[in-house]
Amino acid sequence: MRVSEALMAGKEKKAMTIHEFGDKSNPVLMLFPGTMCYWKGNFGHVIDALSQRFLVAAVAYTGFDENDSEGYTSMTDELEKIEAYIRDHYNGTIRAAYGCSLGGSFVAQLAARHRVHMRYGIIGSSDLDQAGRLKARLLSALMVKVTYNFIHTGEYRSRLMQRRFLRQMAAP
């Protein structure tokens, strides 16, 4: 494992740690954890397998790493550090980025800002993409059953859900 700190150019040093795993000659896969999540908690169980084919770069936002005493300031500050890191360490290009929850917002911003290049951006939802297979299938089936009719007709099949929806839409 290699650990690097990303710094904002021309500003005081504020740590944001990138934990790297795998061969530097492999394509880069950046992993962005969710809100208030420790990178090992989100990704520790998949890093070994991913590092066989990728240089895995797990992001630890400022204030969210065991050796970091700084505090998280803003998404924009972190985004600038991430972009600077990608430019400085990966020549401005990564193969893919995956983010769940808040991490998905970082992936979307990287794509929208066009300051670095990534071939694939994967935006996940920690509710389903980190669940076990059975749990994810059950939750997906439930969500389809609850939302399918609403998506196609604008109304919920369940009278209780429809009344609640209308009540919430009428509230100021």
PLM features: residue spans?
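N-terminal cap/lid segment of alpha/beta-hydrolase-fold proteins
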Residues: 1-15
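Conserved HGGG/HGGXW glycine-rich cap/lid loop of the alpha/beta-hydrolase fold
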Residues: 14-68
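Short aromatic-enriched loop/helix-cap "lid" or pocket-rim segments at secondary-structure transitions
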Residues: 43-44, 68-71, 132-137
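Alpha-helical elements of Rossmann-like donor-binding domains used by nucleotide-donor carbohydrate transfer enzymes
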Residues: 45, 49, 77-85, 109
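Active-site loop/oxyanion-hole signature of alpha/beta-hydrolase fold enzymes
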Residues: 57-98
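Gly/Ala-rich beta-loop-alpha elbow adjacent to hydrolase catalytic centers
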Residues: 99-107
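Flexible "cap/lid" loop of the alpha/beta hydrolase fold
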Residues: 108, 112, 116-150
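Conserved alpha/beta-hydrolase catalytic His-Asp/Glu region
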Residues: 132-138, 148-172
